[in-house]
Amino acid sequence: MMDLADNRTVEYHLEQKKIGDEILIEGSILPSDLREIYQDIVERRFEIYPHADTTSELDYDYPSFDWASYHEYKCLDVFPNLKFLFPYIKECLDLVGDTDYNKYYFKSWINIWPKGQQIVRHNHYGVWHGYYVIKDTGTTTYYQPEEDSQEVVALDNYDGHFTFMPAHLYHWATPNPQDAMRISTGYNISTYEQVLEESELNRNERGGKVENVVVPLKDLLWVK
């Protein structure tokens, strides 16, 4: 299907699938300006990760250098072009029948992977989580349907790859095998009680700042 909005065209195709017994919505979302979005993030990455401007790309490891600032910014304030994703996030919520948008808060961030960067096994606070790959370099993300499950589901990434699923699912991803930077954005959709829980538990020694970077989801979906 194709959308036309904000002086861009968007080709997209989303499918409802399963990871074990859990919901997965996955597919491609390809705006006509995806390359420009990628270049803008690469060129301005130091605004969110200061050491990315002073460290060699091949030596830069943002969890080590800039972990304290990893979630200290409102991603959509820095990179407003990413707001084009919200009609598709709303479509996912509608598909799963979760349409009480007023109860949710939205948080997103940018993942910048130089060569060799990866993410280790983890999950998220919130009800829903997903990611959108702006530029892939041949990586795969693996999911476990249950925390102690032996079953593993592999999702091969690509430019424009979009996912939406329950936030509690454990996942990890393979290292970036190329010199080019792999760029993606991740997002969580949480109740305010979950935001407070993450803040109070000070998860990863930065949870106390979560309240400053969440946005009421209804304000982003343009619904009353």
Report residues per predicted region.
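Fe(II)/2-oxoglutarate
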Residues: M1-K18, G208-K224
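Non-heme Fe(II)/2-oxoglutarate
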Residues: M2-G97, Q118
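Positively charged, low-complexity intrinsically disordered regions
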Residues: T9, E36, R45-F46, N123, ...
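Intrinsically disordered, low-complexity segments enriched in small/polar residues
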Residues: K18, I25, S184, E205-R206
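Glycine-rich loops and low-complexity Gly/Arg-rich segments
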Residues: Y49-A52, V133-D136, I189-Y192, G208-P216
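Short N-terminal helix-initiation segments at or just after the protein's N-terminus
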Residues: D66-P80, S108-W109, W128-V133, R206-V214
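Aromatic-acidic/polar surface patches that form glycan- and anion
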Residues: V78-L82, N123, Q178
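Catalytic core of non-heme Fe(II) oxygenases with the double-stranded beta-helix
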Residues: Y101-T174, A180-S184, N188-R203
